[in-house]
A protein has these predicted regions:
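C-terminal segment of classical bacterial N-terminal signal peptides
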Residues: 13-21
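Function-determining sites in protein domains
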Residues: 22-217
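N-terminal secretory signal peptides that target proteins for export/translocation
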Residues: 1-2
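Sec-dependent N-terminal signal peptides
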Residues: 5-13
Length: 217
């Protein structure tokens, strides 16, 4: 989770970097990012509290999206007693700014426990849930997708992917930006979110088929 301290100076670089984000290779890092700075830990704590739906024990597929300027969100799949559910939970605004984490002004400090998220959920077939989980598995188990990126980006989204669909399966990775393979997960993750909000199922199926073709499934 990257510092926003210098956001003002990098804002003008956003559009130039965005065009280059879809790099020629992925730079996934295994597990979840190890946070050390106090402001990073506070931001992460707020995200996990406000968007707590994304970390419930029934979640078997997850994509956490932490943008530099827009609202944080989590899209995923939950395995419930009634079957599978696609969901999206999103903050009402960028929590970094909502909570005044980058400000020394005490008047801007807010209690994240009072912030209410937006939440959408919708049933999903087991077959489609399994296909989506297979996409996450393909990307997260391919060692070629793990590579240390020497650059430091403060103007792009950070994504964390997780899948625990199969017995004893627990795969997690994070990345700043995206590459040709993790980009497919972004498109499917956003299609899942749209499905949860009522978009036609065919749109999600189309996104899954396209990702399967790109990833060779």
């Amino acid at each position: 989770m990257l510092s926003r301290i210098a956001i003002a100076t990098v804002f003008l670089l956003f559009f130039a970097r965005s065009a280059a984000n879809a790099a020629d290779r992925d730079h996934l890092q295994r597990g979840e990012e190890k946070l050390t700075a106090d402001f990073e830990i506070k931001h992460d704590r707020a995200i996990r509290h406000v968007l707590s739906r994304g970390w419930r024990q029934d979640v078997v597929v997850r994509m956490v999206d932490i943008p530099a300027f827009e609202a944080e969100s989590v899209a995923g799949i939950a395995r419930t007693a009634n079957g599978y559910t696609a969901f999206e939970t999103a903050a009402p605004g960028n929590l970094w700014y909502e909570l005044g984490l980058g400000s020394d002004d005490p008047k801007r400090k807010k209690d994240y426990r009072r912030i209410k998220p937006r939440l959408h959920e919708r049933s999903l077939s087991e077959a489609l849930a399994a296909r989506i989980a297979a996409l996450w598995r393909r990307v997260l188990t391919d060692p070629r997708n793990y590579w240390k990126d020497p650059a430091l980006y403060m103007d792009t989204n950070q994504f964390t992917y997780h899948v625990s669909f199969l017995p004893h399966e627990r795969l997690t990775a994070y990345v700043d930006g995206w590459g040709p393979h993790s980009e497919q997960l972004i498109w499917v993750g956003r299609a899942m979110a749209n499905h949860a909000k009522g978009a036609p199922e065919k749109d999600l199926i189309k996104a899954v088929k396209k990702a399967e073709a790109k990833l060779g499934i």
